[in-house]
Every structure is written in structure tokens, then in C-alpha cells.
């Protein structure tokens, strides 16, 4: 459920959208790109456990958990970046990831930091 009690001075996860505008609000100022980057690696133990899971097929829960945590941390870093410039919303939010080495993955969360007002 969206928290509608928060002040428009606050940037809450409820004011982050993949759309190009925030429903019920008007964008009054664009503050530029906000981003959060996290680089994660698999541990030897985790890699071994995941290798065992691949034998049986299906969801590899160790990697799923690692990916979820990396996205969550990147999202939180993006929120912090947007707060630094005074944003109260983020539009056009996206995730991207790249393997930058053996077992090392970069996850980036980015969007446009904006100031919105009720429409």
C-alpha cells in the first residue's frame, strides 16, 4: 500500500516509478540522474552450493538471494543519491547489471531525480 501520509519533502520508495511521471503529481523540476551502484561477488561456499543446486535444476536460490540483495542495496544507494540533491521523487527508474569478472557482478539502479507537487 502506498504511504500517502508522508510529506512531499520526503523521498520514499512509494515515490519511485518506472513510468516517466508520477501519477497524481506534476514534475516541477528535474534534478538529473540519481544512481546507486553495487558490486557483488559470490563466495566459494556459495558457488559450491549453487553448483549443487544446478544438478537438480530449477531455481538456484543462492544466486536469487544474492541478486535480490544487490538490487535492494543499489536501490537504497539511488535513493540516498537523490536525497542529496533534494529530490522528492524518482521517475524512469531502471536496473541494469553486468558481469565485470568471474563471479563479480555490478548492479546499477538509476532514474531521474525530480521535485513533484500534487496535480
UniProtKB/Swiss-Prot annotation:
Similarity comment text for this entry: Belongs to the UPF0145 family.
Which PANTHER family does the entry mention?
UPF0145 PROTEIN SCO3412, UPF0145 PROTEIN YBJQ
Name used for this protein in its record: UPF0145 protein Bcep18194_B0595
From what superkingdom does this record's organism come?
Answer: Bacteria
